[in-house]
Amino acid sequence: MLSRDRLSRLGLALGIALLAGACLRPLYGDTSPAPGNQNVRDRLSAIEVQEATNRIDQQIRNDLIFAFTGGAAAPEPLYRLRVETNDALQSAVVDPFTSRPTTETYALDATFRLDRIGSTDGKPVFQGRAFGRASYDRSRQRFATIRARRDAEDRAADVVAQQITTQIAAHLATNP
């Protein structure tokens, strides 16, 4: 049998859980009760992503377009997303005999800006930063090292695209 003290603690914990549960809502759920309002998923699919200038930017662009539309046809764009990236290599471990790095980290930093198409005030709807890091081992075989670096670049680009998608979705969910 439960004591009165344990019963009151259990009741308090249950009450807190119920209150906290009422505060949470799904990010991509339909939260627009008024007809004509768009939910987050519809607003994300109406984002046009700028053209890419290199392979890494194209990887990020492809990941963003798929995350926004889910592979479906995009509707008429309401927003334009601009992403600028900077990348660098960081040598983590250096072989003491050859003075060559044996492990490197590919660092990708991105700044992004979401603008409303047709807006004349010049203020962004949302802007932010994202970053991705991916390590890889350097081999004595040149082509293995090139492929490992390319895979690290792709992994870092995926992380950046996921961070951008999550930040924009959270902003659009809280700022209709």
Give the positions of each predicted feature:
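C-terminal/domain-edge helix-coil "capping" segments
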Residues: 147-176
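Hydrophobic and amphipathic membrane-targeting/association helices
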Residues: 2-3, 24-29, 79
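Surface-exposed short loop/turn segments
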Residues: 66, 71-151
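Active-site oxyanion-binding pockets that recognize sulfate/phosphate
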Residues: 46, 50, 54, 143-154
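Sec-dependent bacterial lipoprotein signal peptides
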Residues: 1-23
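Bacterial Sec signal peptide processing site at the extreme N-terminus
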Residues: 17-43
